[in-house]
Every structure is written in C-alpha cells, then in structure tokens.
C-alpha cells in the first residue's frame, strides 16, 4: 500500500477541497512548464511529472512543456568524441554540435517525455520550432570580458506562431517543445530552454509559467537558507538580478520577461519534489517562489 492509499479518507477529501479554487482559476487556461534538472533524469520524478501533465489536461487545463537537455547533449558529445566548448556560460554550437543537439533534444529527451505522458492517454505531441514554423530564431552573441563573442548556432526566440500552437492546445494535445528553430534564412539554431519557455508563455497568453529547478526556490542571499522567498515582485527581482548565482540568472530573466510581458505569475519550483507541479498549482503552501508584476 502506498503512503497516499494509507491516508484517511477525510484527509484525501480535504486535499481535493483545497484544490478546488485553483482548479476553477486555471480551467481553460494555458500553463507553460519549463522541464529540466532532476525531474528530467530521475525515473520516479519523470513519471510523476508526466502524470501531472495528464492530470492537468484531464482537469481542463492546457499544459505546454518546454524542455532542455544540456547534460544529455554533453554526454552524447563525449560518447561521440566531439569536443565541446563554452563561452560566457553558453555552449558554442558548431554545425556538428547542432546535429547532436537535434538528435538528443527531439529524438531522445522529447521522445521519452512524450511516451511517458501518452501512457496516460493520447495527449502529447513532440514538436520543434521547425514544425509549421511554430517559432523562429534570431542569432545571438554573448559578452565575454566586455567583448561581443560569437557562439555559433545559438539563438533567441524571434517570433512565435501563436495560432498554430493554440491549434494543438485546442485539439486537446500537450505540446512537448524541443527548443530548436530556424532563422529567417532557414538555418536552425539551438535556443536556451529557459528563454524559449518565457517567449512561449508570453506569446500564448499563459496564466502561469513554471520553471523546474534543483533548489527549493529563489534565495536572495544564497547560500543563506533563511533567505528563501515565497513571493517577489518584478521590480525587486530586477534589482536583485546582478547579485544572483550564475545558474539562476537565465531562470530569473525568463520569469521577468514572462511577467512583464503579461503572464500573471511565474514560479521557480523545486523539481526534486514528487508531483511538484500539482503541489505548486493546487495547494496553499506551494513549493517554490512566485514572481508577480510590481
């Protein structure tokens, strides 16, 4: 018997009753989820995440999943004997590296998640920006020691084909998005998944953006455990941005972009918690940091 099955019936009923206001608020709304970290590699967490997506779909909520795959790309490059290079925290993406990224993101990571979700019903569809030009890229550079530096086939989201994406949602599908997209000349670029998730959430008019991480939420004075915040506004967060740990910066920038762009709230949540999405969306306590306009 599982721990959930062992709970008294009245406790189960109380949990469901607590979820009702949130279910009503989110019914018919789009929720964009950036999937990554431990939730993408631990088998129990992967299966729980897939079940969460199916749960949302069956509650009349429209999840859209945007996933990364940096560690998996690195592992495949090593297996193939291809040297990887990083500049300014970004992977230098040569045509050879891009071929590996496409294979891993769409052919491995995306496929695995699609299959896990579809174990619950015919819901998930794996896509990239190349499909029906769902989104396009514009090449980007990074600043290293004050100098603009080329990092190859790495882009930012330029435009999102909102109508095509919403067609999938309206058909009851769960888009599972691998962040590869062509530029204006048809040259495919790899896009940071945090950046892409924010752009998709903004374009679709999502009700929420959820960013799965491997920490409890946002710490304003890391590693001070007492500095974890449950809610923060965009003005305060923007001022805090230069002081944050490097790994948190893309996630915080994504939250800022989404909320300033019209998404009512963005959430940095602990992907190490089983069913973290349901905990954040449907309980009063939540499991991370909520970012709101302010």
UniProtKB/Swiss-Prot annotation:
This is Acetylglutamate kinase. It is an enzyme of class 2 (transferase). Its main location: cytoplasm. It comes from Mycobacterium tuberculosis (strain CDC 1551 / Oshkosh). It comes from the Bacteria. GO terms for molecular function: acetylglutamate kinase activity; ATP binding. The record marks 34, 251 as: Transition state stabilizer. Keywords: Amino-acid biosynthesis, Arginine biosynthesis, ATP-binding, Cytoplasm, Kinase, Nucleotide-binding, Transferase. Pathway: Amino-acid biosynthesis; L-arginine biosynthesis; N(2)-acetyl-L-ornithine from L-glutamate: step 2/4. One of its GO terms (cellular component) is cytoplasm. PANTHER family: N-ACETYLGLUTAMATE SYNTHASE (PTHR23342), N-ACETYLGLUTAMATE SYNTHASE, MITOCHONDRIAL (PTHR23342:SF0). It holds the Pfam family AA_kinase. The keyword Iron does not apply. Substrate binds at residues 69-70, 91, 190. It is found in: Cytoplasm. Disulfide bonds: none annotated. The keyword Kinase applies. Catalyzes the ATP-dependent phosphorylation of N-acetyl-L-glutamate. One of its GO terms (biological process) is arginine biosynthetic process via ornithine. Belongs to the acetylglutamate kinase family. ArgB subfamily. It catalyses: N-acetyl-L-glutamate + ATP = N-acetyl-L-glutamyl 5-phosphate + ADP. The lineage of its organism: Bacteria, Bacillati, Actinomycetota, Actinomycetes, Mycobacteriales.
